[in-house]
Structures are given as structure tokens and as C-alpha cells.
Amino acid sequence: LRGWFVGEWRISIRKGICIDEWNVLMRDEAANGAVQEDMKARLTELNENEILLYLGYRGQEYPAEIRKQIERCEREVVTAAQPRLVWRRLPVDGELFSALHLEGKDIRELLEGCSEAVLMAVTLGQGIERLLAKSSVSNMADAVIMDACASTAIENVADNFEFDLRGEVEEEGKYLTDRFSPGYGDLPLFSQRQLCAALDTGRKIGLLLSPSLLMIPGKSVTAILGISDEPKALRKRGCESCSLFRS
């Protein structure tokens, strides 16, 4: 598997965490929270407006035949999707979370006042990759629309997990932040390595990283959320929440 990996620990080794120490931390589930598989990945009805946004529509009219094409492509994407989820809840003052070495002001702000963090990863599976590859050869217009549908679908799965988790956390009398992914704001993209390794995404849901940090399958999401005893204002979705946008 060299060249395709879940987590290559050069970064952590450079920061003083050797592989053996990391493996011990991973096994210490009592202190660091077991990898969870009790909550199912849910793909529900796709939001047509989101699909249109991915396609570049901003409220303008479009022909009936385009609508039919979108509906057909959406059905094919939903049929091909095999959503999978893995997540882990752990204390922010624990050794495992500290070993993640998450950098940046934005993630510190997100987790300020939080006693726990949730690491999550979701994917639509390889069936979507095959569908997109096939359509890119046979019908490029379909390929563009299917890509938009698949992007909407993976966000749908991530949103549904966040919704379900929020309900679970609120039953405990606690509060959940919104999710924050590597590459957002000033959280480096290389944090993907740490998240995928901590969640064992390769074995759990078939999610790997390329040497250039691209997720395989491509329609996948990793993210971090915080759990606090006090409510926290949720950030706006999109570029407005990014420190790079504000600077």
C-alpha cells in the first residue's frame, strides 16, 4: 500500500510522536474513545437548489429537458452511492487528541470551551467513482451533472450525521458546534492524515489518501466538531466563515 495511505506519520514523528507511541494511544479506547460504528450513514432526498448551485445556476431559468437530465442523473447517483460513516468522540485534553497536532487559529476558536471533540469521516464509496469515470467518457454533460449531484449527496450524508449527533449530544444536556474540515480557513490540509489515521478510515470505510492528500474515493468528507457545556454560535456555511476570506 505504499503510495496510498491512511496516515503517514512523518509529521507526527517530526513532532515527537513515534509510531509505537501512536499505536498505544489508538488502542487506549478507555482514555481516547472507541471508533464508533453505531450511527448509520444516511443519504436522504437531495436538495435540488444545492445541485443547481454546484452547476453554476443562481436563480435563472433553465429548460425542462435540463431538469429531466438532472433528475435522471440524480437517480443514478443515489443508486450508485454506498454511504459509509466512521466517527470517534474523545476528550480534547487526552493524549490522542493532543497527538493530532491540529494547527491554526480557526480550529482553536471552534474548540474553545469544548471538553470533547468528535472526529468524523463519511464517503459515498467507489461506486460513485466508477459512475463518474464512466460518464466522463460516454457523456460529459451527464458527468458534470452527476458530479454536482454527488457533491450534494456527500454533504447530505455529513449534514445528516451532524443532525443525528446534535440530537444525541443535546439529550446529554450538551451542545455541538458545527463541523470544520481540513483545508477550511487556516487548518492545514495535511490534517487529513491525522484524522484518517485516528479513525482508521482505510479499514473502516475504505477511505484512503493519495500522497497529494486527495481522498479516495473523492466524494468523501472528514471533519472535526466540538462538544461543550455551553451553547456556541454556529459559523456561517461557505466562504464567509473562512479566515482567508475575511483577511
Model-derived segments and spans:
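Long, amphipathic alpha-helical coupling/dimerization segments that relay conformational signals between
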Residues: 136-186
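Short terminal or interdomain "cap/linker" segment that borders an active site or interface and mediates
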Residues: 172-238, 244-247
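Generic secondary-structure signature for well-ordered alpha-helical cores
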Residues: 75-82, 166, 170, 200, ...
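Conserved active-site and cofactor/substrate-binding residues in soluble primary-metabolism enzymes
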Residues: 65-68, 72, 149-152, 156, ...
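Active-site helix-to-loop segments that bind/position phosphate- or nucleotide-bearing substrates
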Residues: 22-146
